[in-house]
Structures are given as C-alpha cells and as structure tokens.
Amino acid sequence: MRKKILAIDDEVDTLTFYSELLDDYNFTPITAENGVEGLKKAREEKPDLILLDIMMPKKSGMKTFKELKNDPDLYNIPVIIITGISKEVDYKSLLNRPSTRGMPPEGHLVKPLTADNLIKEITKVLG
C-alpha cells in the first residue's frame, strides 16, 4: 500500500512539484494550500507524513505544527518542517516552545529544495 503524504504549502507551484515527485516515488500525495485546509485534510486522511511550510497566510506553519502536536489523533504523524531559515540556531528557537508539548518535528529542510534532498528526508523519517 502506498504511503500518504500531506504537503501543506501556500505556493501552488511547490504543491505541484511535491505532488508529481511523490507520485513518481509511489507515495499518495495530498495537498493543502494553507494551515486551516491542512489540518482538515490531516484529520480526514490520516497521512503517514506531513510536509509543512513555515511561512503561510491564514495559519502559519508554526501554528499548524502546534495544533498537530496538541491533537490526540494527529500528534504521532511525523512532520518535516520546510523553511527558508538556514541557521540551525534560528530554526531551534522557533521550536523551543512549550506549546508544542516538547515535540520537535521529525525532519527539517531548507528551501530551495531539490528532489533528491526531499526524497532522502522523507525516506529517513518514514524509516
């Protein structure tokens, strides 16, 4: 059975890239254009992994991440955070907040992404 991956990003071109790439690697892609839609799809689809952009309108990636990790039905879904933040210190400060129940994301990628880096990180996180 193909694993389901939910990609949450406000850029349609990025979602298209994810969708095509994930399909090519035998994953079932699910997409959402913002955090509100992403949380809804996570609850409906119960994906095996979530790719989550940090900078989005309506609901930021950090707020979405906090809601995922505080939801008893969703907290165990692994999340790969995708950000433009390249400094490890800045990235860690974003996640060093009690509202995520001390649960860091399972992966982190910095934009711009390559297909190879994305697939390697997904494979690492999914085991």
Question: For the regions a protein language model found, what residue spans apply to each?
Answer:
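Receiver (REC) domain active-site loop signature in two-component systems and cognate sites
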Residues: M56
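Short amphipathic alpha-helix used as the core "switch/output" element in two-component signaling
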Residues: K40, M62-Y75
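Active-site residues of response regulator receiver
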Residues: D9, D53, T83
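Charged docking surfaces used in two-component/phosphorelay signaling
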Residues: T16-D24
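A short, hydrophobic beta-strand element within the central beta-sheet of small alpha/beta folds
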Residues: N76-V89
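Active-site beta3 strand of CheY-like receiver
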Residues: E45-L51
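Alpha4 helix (beta4-alpha4-beta5 surface) of REC/receiver domains from two-component response regulators
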Residues: K63, E67, S86-L109, D116, ...
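Helix N-cap/capping motif at the beta->alpha junctions
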Residues: T31-K40, G61
